[in-house]
């Protein structure tokens, strides 16, 4: 049950980052995701071996990032016109509130690596992979989505919590589709983060 210790650590790190905020958010996020990357690497270092299908997986990752951005653009349109979540624009603004803490170019780089890399490498690359060997694809998928969503609940931001649930479902399903190959979800997360936060923000 060692994985539960790592999940508990992620809960603590996310609570510190999003709620306590003792230091600059981006420094805290970079440290947290780097730490989770090290944990994931120690447990599943064979994931980083280059395979002959690497280029294909990278292209799928880039394409899926574009698809996910389109889903969120459509979601923003629905929220604006149907109003499923009251005061959703306040929630979106809160997500982008940390944008002024560093220059945009630096935030974009950090979102690509280590943040996007570290998040995906831990949640899908380590946790979902580890659970799939014990419980199979479906249970590991559902448990990972639950934990990934739950670490965002202390923010009390319904937009962020819903977003975490959706991307957790998306990247978890992509991981299963690619037969537990982490490359496509990894690239997808690394590309999508700076795209939606810096390059083409939805606020």
Where are these regions (language model features)?
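N-terminal, membrane-interfacial amphipathic/helix-forming hydrophobic leader that caps
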Residues: 1-62, 66-70, 77-78, 194, ...
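Hydrophobic alpha-helical transmembrane segments
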Residues: 4-8, 13-22, 58-63, 105-109, 138-143, 150-156, 174-176, ...
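Hydrophobic core segments of transmembrane alpha-helices in multi-pass, intramembrane catalytic enzymes
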Residues: 28-36, 111, 163-171
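Juxtamembrane helix-loop-helix connectors linking adjacent transmembrane helices
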Residues: 47-115
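Functionally important transmembrane alpha-helices
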Residues: 160-203
